[in-house]
Amino acid sequence: MLEGRRLLITGVITNRSIAYATAVRAQELGAEILLTSFGRARRLTERAAKRLPEPVDVLELDVNSPDDLAALTAELQRRWGRVDGALHAIAHAPGDAFGGDFLATPPESAEAAFRTSAYSLNALAVALRPLWREAGDGSLVGLDFDATVAWPAYDWMGVAKAALEATSRYLARDLGGENVRVNLVSAGP
């Protein structure tokens, strides 16, 4: 089903994540994949990458770094020349943006949650756009969580997930004419 497809998968930290299960299934269906990670998590991602049915490389990507995004585009162009799809499994909020004290969250923590968990979908799409053009089409799938409910202690991450949902709609609108599909999948609570 995915024979010959080239997929970028973000967010693999352990072999217990949805992103890891996606990587396994993609390989089972014949896809060629690469993972991304950065910082302290990279060592964990590299360990998980070795447990895949076929071990893969882990590319450096801090999705908030324009330099990393540009380097990702260049490296994917060098290796593959195109990308058929990507999984956005990226989310983060500082500890003070969780925990039930929504009103006391500093603005820089709320902004960090938004930038990493929502705006990053747009940043990844911009980085991959030239590679989807080479492929003639593409798919961007993001992992979501129900943002229609004010979940206890989820706080600013819930706001970021609502922004992620809106971001995906705008990306679908703007990339649809280029044969790029943008969808979110919610794993639920």
For the regions a protein language model found, what residue spans apply to each?
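Catalytic loop of short-chain dehydrogenase/reductase
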Residues: G11-T22, H92-R129, R133-G177, S186-P189
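Structural signature of beta-strand start/N-cap positions in the alpha/beta core
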Residues: R6, E32, D57, R82, ...
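Rossmann-fold cofactor-recognition segment
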Residues: A49-D67
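Glycine-rich phosphate-binding loop signature in dinucleotide/nucleotide-binding domains
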Residues: L76-G81, A135
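Conserved hydrophobic beta-strands of the Rossmann-like cofactor-binding core
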Residues: R6-T10, V83-A91
